[in-house]
Curated annotation (Swiss-Prot):
Keywords: Cytoplasm, Protein biosynthesis. The gene is frr. The keyword Cytoplasm applies. Its main location: cytoplasm. GO terms for cellular component: cytoplasm. Responsible for the release of ribosomes from messenger RNA at the termination of protein biosynthesis. May increase the efficiency of translation by recycling ribosomes from one round of translation to another. This is Ribosome-recycling factor.
Length: 185
């Protein structure tokens, strides 16, 4: 019982950490990365599909993303999806491939991105705290139903707090690394 609650809580922490990593990977820094565009949704064949299913995405230079659609008829739809995204990138095409130059970020834009990173990290920390509260409530219910002892309840609460502290440190580190990446000129 106790281990089930703790295992479930650990799984939530892993999901939250991975979700943060995934979200931060899509935030543009001054360097080109396929992660910036691979999950853009493109209207294709009567439905919405992620770009990485419609094209080969490569980064031949530090400030250039090259997108080679599997179907040349998709170039306009892919360009439209890029222009409608909030990336602020201007695609150009030669009929076969789309070139996406990634300009260096202005100081003002870097500061905005750092704020976005901090905000997202804080949102995930709030989610972690809410999960902690739910896990502790689950333990208290088990104790009230006499399925675990009071000592087990306290051990469980301590373990959950240790996991929360470790996860919070990891989230802070992920955020700090992304901030440093954004601020690097």
């Amino acid at each position: 019982m106790l281990n089930d609650v703790i295992s479930e809580y650990e799984a939530h922490l892993k999901k939250a950490t991975e979700a943060l990593r995934h979200h931060l990977a899509s935030i543009r820094t001054g360097r080109a990365s396929s992660a910036l565009v691979e999950h853009l949704h493109v209207e294709a064949y009567g439905m919405t599909m992620p770009l990485n299913q419609l094209a080969n995405i490569s980064v031949p230079e530090p400030r250039l993303i090259v997108i080679q659609p599997y179907d040349a008829n998709m170039i306009k739809a892919i360009e439209k999806a890029i222009q409608q995204s909030d990336l602020g990138l201007n695609p150009s095409n030669d009929g076969r491939v789309i070139r996406l130059p990634v300009p260096p970020l202005t100081e003002e834009r870097r500061r905005e991105l750092v704020k976005m990173v901090r905000h997202r990290v804080e949102e995930v920390k709030i989610s972690v705290r809410n999960q902690r509260r739910d896990a502790i409530d689950d333990l208290k219910k088990l104790e009230a139903e006499k399925l675990i002892s009071e000592d087990e309840l306290h051990r469980g609460q301590e373990r959950i707090q240790q996991l929360t502290d470790r996860c919070t440190r990891e989230l802070d580190q992920i955020g700090a690394e992304k901030e440093a990446e954004v601020m690097a000129v």
